[in-house]
């Protein structure tokens, strides 16, 4: 309509819709979107409403699973039960990274969440079943001072099950983190045969577990 040409005589090249064989007769995709939105001064053929809208359904028959390996080094004060994370290394395979910066942010946030699950985020209830950790004064979250600099590595093995070769990235940050931290604590306290069966593990609980150990 804008170029006064039939649909079959149009092509999209370099961000423009243009008439085949007459590249000077063209309109940019941005201008086309502005017009279709209903820009003043443009009329539409009868039966055509302003708007730029399309819908489609994409179905994935097979899921794309992510993989990760997290390694943590911790220091535990056996007198206070305090835990300090000295080093955190995370190797991720989230398929093709379309936007590496967003992937890095997702992984960092996931690790922080997992550390919180392992050490801080306790949800408590009173005898009547009412929550007692209802503010951030009671429900503790990790801050920057609780976390080390994360060392992140990436192996891109594109998924064969979708056109972009992508996999989920949120899960590979958060799910291994808590297990890696707890495993590191158990390893650090191996002389005391400490086994941790619930999260988060609080300092006073670690002191009690150490005291129950063979060398406690």
Q: PLM features: residue spans?
A:
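C-terminal catalytic domains of large/alpha subunits in multi-subunit enzymes
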Residues: 1-216
């Amino acid at each position: 309509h804008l170029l006064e040409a039939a649909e079959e005589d149009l092509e999209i090249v370099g961000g423009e819709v243009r008439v085949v064989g007459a590249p000077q007769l063209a309109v940019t995709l941005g201008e086309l979107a502005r017009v279709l939105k209903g820009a003043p001064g443009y009329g539409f053929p009868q039966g055509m409403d302003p708007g730029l809208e399309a819908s489609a359904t994409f179905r994935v028959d097979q899921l794309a699973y992510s993989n990760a390996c997290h390694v943590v080094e911790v220091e535990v004060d056996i007198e206070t039960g305090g835990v300090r994370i000295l080093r955190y290394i995370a190797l991720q395979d989230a398929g093709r990274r379309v936007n590496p910066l967003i992937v890095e942010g997702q992984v960092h946030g996931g690790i922080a969440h997992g550390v919180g699950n392992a050490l801080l985020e306790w949800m408590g209830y009173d005898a009547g079943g009412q929550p007692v950790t209802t503010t951030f004064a009671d429900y503790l979250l990790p801050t920057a001072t609780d976390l080390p600099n994360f060392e992140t590595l990436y192996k891109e093995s594109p998924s064969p099950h979708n056109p972009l070769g992508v996999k989920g990235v949120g899960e590979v940050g958060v799910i291994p983190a808590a297990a890696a931290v707890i495993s590191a604590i158990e390893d650090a306290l191996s002389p005391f045969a400490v086994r941790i069966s619930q999260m988060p593990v609080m300092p006073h609980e670690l002191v009690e577990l150490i005291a129950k150990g063979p060398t406690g």
